Amino acid sequence: MHLGITAAAAGLAAWIACGPFESNAADSAYSLFAPTNLVAWCIVPFDAKKRGPEERAAMLEHLGFSQFAYDYRAEHIPGFDAEMEALKRHHIRLLAWWFPTDFNDEARLILDVLKRHHLTGVQLWVMGAGGATTNAGDQKARVASEADRIERIARPALPLGSPVALYNHGGWFGEPENQLEIIALLQSRGVTNVGIVYNLHHGHDQVKRFPELLARMKPHLLAINLNGMTPGGDKTGKLILPLGQGELDLELLRDIRASGWHGPIGLLNHTDEDAESRLRENLRGLEQLVQQLDNPAPASEIKPLPSR
């Protein structure tokens, strides 16, 4: 996609103005877990009611969400424009788009949709996979290969001011240390519009070192998606839980707040349930957790919310 010098300059200006790391700036009026900072996630293919664009946007507005991260499947592609129009009608900001893993025709189509609807600064969430590397040479080659792949997406996204967010989804790519190596290599190439979106539901094996990982990710962190977290939940049928029902939820929220990071907070459905019902449940759980953040009792002594 060739946007020309003028469009590219405009996109670069948008990137500078609303770049991915601006949210780390101090702001005395900022409230990390306020409704205005929340993002609805995993509610398009994950929705028992199979809402269309208008129903979905109306539901988000009714629940008080002002931001949305768009995930999709092949059947949703014909409705891309309708989705953008519905979001605009209901005053919902498109924060992020679940993006193809390489720069293919579908990726070009998405950037064209963003351009057509004058949407700048939309995060592109890109996942990866891969087994563990076996030695230093293997690691170096893997980092270079993944950096090449991400660069193919990041450079065409820059004219629209869109940052690419590396999305942890398990495997080698889902380890923050590896993502940070990819980002460092890209920065050495002059590619600076790449950050991280961290998903708790894909981080069960990382919770014990979460504060350490959070500190390292913080300069590059674009968003955090919350989830009800219990030890080993991914191995015991509790991969996805409503907020407040996980034993680790309060401790993790305290870690996030204590880090000083500022940025969007995602609430997800990611189940076959009605998206509205699960979002309501997460909103309720988050509200009750926030009320306990300053409770002097250790998180381990505060009982999780009962399940439905």
Predicted features and spans:
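Active-site mouth loops of central-metabolism enzymes
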Residues: 39-52, 71, 98-102, 135-143, ...
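Catalytic domains of carbohydrate-active enzymes, especially glycoside hydrolases
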Residues: 53-76, 95
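Histidine-acidic metal/acid-base catalytic patches
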Residues: 26-39, 51-58, 148-155, 176-308
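Bacterial N-terminal signal peptides
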Residues: 4-19
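Active-site-adjacent beta->alpha loops and helix N-cap segments on the catalytic face
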Residues: 76-83, 175
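Active-site beta-loop-alpha junctions enriched in small/polar residues
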Residues: 43-46, 72-75, 99-102, 127-131, ...
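Active-site acidic/histidine proton-transfer and metal-coordination neighborhood
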Residues: 16, 93-94, 102-196, 299
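Hydrophobic faces of well-ordered beta-strands that scaffold small-molecule active sites
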Residues: 37-43, 68-70, 94-97, 120-126, ...
